[in-house]
Amino acid sequence: MINRKAIGYITANYSSTYGSVLLKDRPIASVPFLGRYRLIDFPLSNMMNAGIKTVGVVMPGNYRSLIDHVGSGKDWGLDRKKGGLFMVPGNAYGTTKGGMRFLLRDIISNKTLFQRSDKPYVVMMGTNIIFNMDLNTIIDAHENSGAQMTVVYCKATRNVDDETKLEINENGRLTGVSAGVVYGDNASMDCCIVNRETLLEIIDHYQAADYLDLLEALQATLATSTCAVTSTRARSWACLARSRCIAAAWTCSTRP
């Protein structure tokens, strides 16, 4: 199955605000999980299961562990002549700046990836949250909403400073964005669907403010009501519950 509606964009150039010896020389995207997996396997697998065949991965300065694990993308069907896996440049400071998942500077630097696509949508994902989700359902919901962007969220189960709070009205429209969540808040899952043309407009508009994150730019856009943004709540089963269920949904690299 080939998804003819969307391309993928994964940000792998940031670390965690929580200190760990595992993060000393690597981004969070290449942190091991249950032995054989790395955290980047999960967004790649979600995109593979949705039939997305063009994926750009934003690389950090300390990219060796990612290259060693992902390779050519063969394990996700991304070693292709048309489309495939693209390792695109990222900004080194993005590896440690808390709360930043979709830096505009990275998006602007990789404008060509979006310009060359003939797909109408871009699926953007981070690598710090593990979940299994049918992205085709989210893409269809976005298409039916008529919004320029759809943000996936869940209810926060704890207080976290390094996550993004979403304010959502009774119609499911996003009305505000802020840093930090407490229990029960609407927490972004660092997954969104955006119209490709809208993303290109954002790139052109924010050339001089490329230090912002996409959601920070979104906050300014909401204030001027120039962009319609809807939201989709992730069902509770979308998050990891049992390790024995992983093999059916997720693919890991066969490389060492």
Name what the model sees in each region:
Residues R36-Y37, M48-G51, N62, H69:
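Extended, compositionally biased accessory segments flanking or bridging domains
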Residues T54-P60, V151-Y153:
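Short internal beta-strands
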Residues R64-M87:
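Acidic donor-binding segment of Leloir-type glycosyltransferases
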Residues G73-D75, L166-N171:
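Short, hinge-like loop/turn segments at secondary-structure boundaries
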Residues I139, N169-P256:
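Catalytic-core segments of class I nucleotidyltransferases/pyrophosphorylases
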Residues M1-L34, S45, A50-I52:
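N-terminal nucleotide-binding beta1-loop-alpha1 segment
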Residues G84-K165:
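Conserved beta-loop-beta/alpha segment of the NTase-like Rossmann-fold superfamily
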